């Protein structure tokens, strides 16, 4: 017998997943692990530490702040190492300090100052002129920027690639359309995926064009403390330069808080992106139900606890559920965050701590869709059998050609012929033969079938990028 020994740490990690309140840190922890370095309490503290140190270094580089000597190489290296080597144990130290301060940002300030106990000159300028929100708004801005660049964009690109592959592979595969749930003019399987891809690309491009703003201007946004201490300094320029050094856009005219308008735009963008995915998930679910799409069998998976035959569309259902959760949170963020009483209230603090939760649900959804799409197979036999028995969809083609050649009441005549009736090829052929139109037009209609009446679907699919 082979005994598999697990370390205490491994056991603790397993227990943490089992006892987590949120499924993001429990059942789905393996799918959201990459988010924890950004949006966890550790991640937030790490960004706060970085911002405090970078602000201190900028002040030291300003020759007009004569009470703070320019840092030598050793001091700068020591400060940089605090950022570069910051780990969970450091975050735990900050949390221990917070037990005394009962203030999370002040705890960060004290954590840094303890690294320089013998340098009162340095400690006096840690958090200089700042309100907590100066640090926090920049931290959340950097977090959302990092999430966009290192997590959301790569996932979106992967999803777009899979959708594009299906679009191009099946651009010429005719499929019956349905409007209002009823048969409609044919399309192609690929064109329907191209529709989704086009929407996603537009929204993703807009996401990447959103400017991410930050502010550092003091307790009510007027540089009161900065200006009274050093009136000779150009604090507007110093603040702008600092924020730009973090690869953010400066917002100089604010109250105590950066107003979060860009954040609302970011959230609204992800709502729109997720809504397109929700639309696609439901359509794929429907096509699976119709038998148009099949799911590749995974040998050891179980579809139902009682019905052995089932292969359920669980990936698309999982995506749908998580997209709904993400959007409900993003909607609240977008409505709540731009509102703050007078110059500031604290209601945004607890709300912003959940930004990673909303993104996490979206990440789970995209990963579920990638898994589901990779198991999809198109059943062209079922699709073809369905479309070839729906001759009534050619009513549109016939009445439109009749219009061209001036035949009276074309729509009304086709409505009488087709609406509510079982239409066959022979019925349509007899009707076309009776029409007074040029032979070439008549032959074109006689040779037309439901599967060839796809317009420019294939050409349009090729436009998808």
Language-model features, listed with the residues they occupy:
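Short amphipathic alpha-helical segments with heptad-repeat character
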Residues: 145-153, 157, 194-197, 201, ...
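A helix-coil-helix interface module used to build multimeric assemblies
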Residues: 14-223, 230-239, 303-304, 316, ...
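N-terminal amphipathic/basic-hydrophobic helices that include classical n-h-c signal peptides
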Residues: 1-12
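Generic, well-ordered alpha-helical scaffold segments in large soluble proteins
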Residues: 55-59, 111, 115, 147, ...
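Conserved helix-loop functional segments at active or binding sites
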Residues: 169-173, 206-209, 213, 244, ...
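Acidic, glycine-rich loop-and-beta core segments that form the ion-binding/anion-interacting portion
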Residues: 235-316, 320
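Glycine-rich cofactor/substrate-binding loops
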Residues: 14-46, 97-102, 291-292, 304-465
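A structural signal for small-residue-enriched, beta-sheet-centric alpha/beta enzyme cores
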Residues: 132, 227-230, 250-257, 383, ...
């Amino acid at each position: 017998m082979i005994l598999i020994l697990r370390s205490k740490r491994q056991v603790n990690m397993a227990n943490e997943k089992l006892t987590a309140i949120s499924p993001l840190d429990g059942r789905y922890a393996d799918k959201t692990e990459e988010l924890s370095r950004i949006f966890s309490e550790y991640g937030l503290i790490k960004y706060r530490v970085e911002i405090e140190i970078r602000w201190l270094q900028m002040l030291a580089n300003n020759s007009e702040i004569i009470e703070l000597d320019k840092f030598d190489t050793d001091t700068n290296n020591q400060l940089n190492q605090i950022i570069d080597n910051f780990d969970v144990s450091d975050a735990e130290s900050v949390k221990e300090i917070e037990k005394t301060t009962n203030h999370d940002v002040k705890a960060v300030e004290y954590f840094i100052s303890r690294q320089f106990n013998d340098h009162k000159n340095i400690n006096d300028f840690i958090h200089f002129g700042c309100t907590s929100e100066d640090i926090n708004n920049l931290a959340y801005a950097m977090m959302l920027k990092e999430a966009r660049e290192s997590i959301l964009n790569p996932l979106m690109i992967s999803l777009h690639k899979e959708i594009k592959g299906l679009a191009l592979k099946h651009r010429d595969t005719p499929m019956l359309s349905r409007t209002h749930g009823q048969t409609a003019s044919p399309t192609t399987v690929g064109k329907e995926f191209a529709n989704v891809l086009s929407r996603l690309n537009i929204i993703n491009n807009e996401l990447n064009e959103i400017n991410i703003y930050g502010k550092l201007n003091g307790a009510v946004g007027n540089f009161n403390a900065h200006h009274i201490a050093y009136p000779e300094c150009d604090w507007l320029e110093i603040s702008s330069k600092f924020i730009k050094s973090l690869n953010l856009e400066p917002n100089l005219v604010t109250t105590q808080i950066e107003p979060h308008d860009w954040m609302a735009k970011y959230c609204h963008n992800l709502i729109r992106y997720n809504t397109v995915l929700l639309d696609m998930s439901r359509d794929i679910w429907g096509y699976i139900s119709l038998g148009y799409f099949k799911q590749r069998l995974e040998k050891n998976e179980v579809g139902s606890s009682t019905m052995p035959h089932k292969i359920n569309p669980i990936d698309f259902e999982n995506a749908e559920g998580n997209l709904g959760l993400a959007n409900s949170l993003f909607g609240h963020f977008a409505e709540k965050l731009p509102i703050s009483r007078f110059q500031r209230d604290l209601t945004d603090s607890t709300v912003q701590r959940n930004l990673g939760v909303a993104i996490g649900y979206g990440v789970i959804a995209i990963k579920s869709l990638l898994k589901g799409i990779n198991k999809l197979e198109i059943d062209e036999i079922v699709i073809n059998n369905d479309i070839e028995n729906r001759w009534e969809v050619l009513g549109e083609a016939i009445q439109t050609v009749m219009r061209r050649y001036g035949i009276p009441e074309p729509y009304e005549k086709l409505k009488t012929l087709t609406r509510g009736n079982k239409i066959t090829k022979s019925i349509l052929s007899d009707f076309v033969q009776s029409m007074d139109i040029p032979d070439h037009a008549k032959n074109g209609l006689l040779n037309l079938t439901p599967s060839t009446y796809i317009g420019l679907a294939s050409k349009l699919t090729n436009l998808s990028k």
